[in-house]
Amino acid sequence: MESVGCCGDCRGSSVDPRSTFVLSNLAEVVERVLTFLPAKALLRVACVCRLWRECVRRVLRTHRSVTWISAGLAEASHLERHCLVRVVAEELENVRILPHTVLYMADSETFISLEECRGHKRARKRTSMETALALEKLFPKQCQVLGIVTPGIVVTPMGSGSNRPQEIEIGESGFALLFPQIEGIKIQPFHFIKDPKNLTLERHQLTEVGLLDNPELRVVLVFGYNCCKVGASNYLQQVVSTFSDMNIILAGGQVDNLSSLTSEKNPLDIDASGVVGLSFSGHRIQSATVLLNEDVSDEKTAEAAMQRLRAANIPEQNTIGFMFACVGRGFQYYRAKGNVEADAFRKFFPSVPLFGFFGNGEIGCDRIVTGNFILRKCNEVKDDDLFHSYTTIMALIHLGSSK
């Protein structure tokens, strides 16, 4: 999947000359026909002639909705490739948008081969990087790809945002969120690697990725990886504290590993620790988060939390839901009843797809950002109140009208 680039002149052939004339000269007709093609096919036909290339550009600009590719237990297998790599390779043929930014998450047990015995760290690292590279190669070269691996995955099956989301606490699974280039919205990946010799964060580092001096900043998804390493959790809190006092939505948690970040030139070190994420900027963005604390322990209290999120009145169209839960929640936490929180979300948000993970710590609080209205300003929330365990963070991100 590559960008529109080649061009030529439409030439006649043995087909009906009237059809040739229409498809060579009437842009309105060509555009109408091309709207039915997926992005990969559009990029191929863009090489037919200059007229078609310009029509392809216009058609792609109208495809602004976020798309997702998901792989759950039904797609899992014992084949050599992780199910997410296999499903992405198949489904990208039918995707209608040109991905500009991709966020993918996969289960750590199968993605990085944690079943390898001790003494085979080098083999495990190679397997992880090979899987990540295979996934990255499927996307356009100019696409920004951020990938993380976690103990468990929350995913909405493909086909419709109203499909029942699945909490997959154990097992091969994953998803890829595909963001097109959306007018008026900027999505930037960021990465801060913990360096024991230099723990200072320079202001320009934060400014370059949209985390400081950015009046349009609305949402930050932030993930600490390899936080079991000495000092890693403190470093995560240090990074978050630099922008947590702003009126933005902040959501995320601690994951096992960072597996992909194509915007960086140097290869990733699977043994390193640091902080990674995405910043979302643009006045059209609306967002809200709620915290499900330890008091939320049954269906009734979970639904009450979703009612608080629903009260934010975030539009459902072109909106994504995120669920960042502790590995200590889920099936066992709800007395052997599975999918409680995902089902509660679906009850109050019937058409919003939900994605996320079961991780090792959660970041966020109750907050709403819609235009100039802030439910709870960040400077009223202490840093300690943003970091949790045995909780779940539910978030909504609305990216404006898709029209």
Swiss-Prot record:
Gene: FBXO22
N-acetylmethionine PTM positions: M1
Alphabetic keyword roster: Acetylation, Cytoplasm, Phosphoprotein, Ubl conjugation pathway
GO BP terms, alphabetized: positive regulation of proteasomal ubiquitin-dependent protein catabolic process; protein polyubiquitination; regulation of skeletal muscle fiber development
Name of protein: F-box only protein 22
Pfam families: F-box, FIST_C
Bilayer-spanning residue ranges: none
Transit peptide recorded as keyword: no
UniProt entry tagged with the keyword Lipid metabolism: no
F-box domain residues: 19-71
Modified positions (N6-acetyllysine) in chain numbering: K194
Role played: Substrate-recognition component of the SCF (SKP1-CUL1-F-box protein)-type E3 ubiquitin ligase complex. Promotes the proteasome-dependent degradation of key sarcomeric proteins, such as alpha-actinin (ACTN2) and filamin-C (FLNC), essential for maintenance of normal contractile function.
Subunit: Directly interacts with SKP1 and CUL1.
Organism lineage: Eukaryota, Metazoa, Chordata, Craniata, Vertebrata
Principal location listed in the UniProt entry: cytoplasm
Record localization: Cytoplasm, Myofibril, Sarcomere, Z line
Modified residues (Phosphoserine): S128
Organism: Pongo abelii (Sumatran orangutan)
GO cellular component: a single term: Z disc
UniProt cross-references to InterPro entries, sorted A to Z: F-box-like_dom_sf (IPR036047), F-box_dom (IPR001810), FIST_C (IPR019494)
